């Protein structure tokens, strides 16, 4: 069975975006994102797909959209999370990585079995996209790693991995 895995970076108030862009510069988090997703299918919304500027190489780029249109070559339109899961399953993928935005996270959260969250130690002014609140009692933290800000990483971060209770 293909697991639904949410991957996101969020601030203290769950902000994940501003003006269709990431509101921070975190080089190490981008490297971590690549390591977590390379070779796996991705599910994203249309705005997230547009913000990427291109299809991410080495990954199947699935865009959840009602219109059936995708912004860039190398991306595929899907009409539902079920369709995305079917495609991932047909490819033999163990995980379907959900990478945003806010509406897609909210849609997928009830079915997700794992989350890789980057907790960014800041509060974004003017944020307009948010990761959904979730019931901590339904999740078990299985890993946490702290990193300090430096010349390539604008803020302190914590990488936290959660597994839904009963799914580990």
Task: Say what each PLM segment does.
Residues 4-168:
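Flexible, gly/pro- and Lys/Arg-enriched active-site loops
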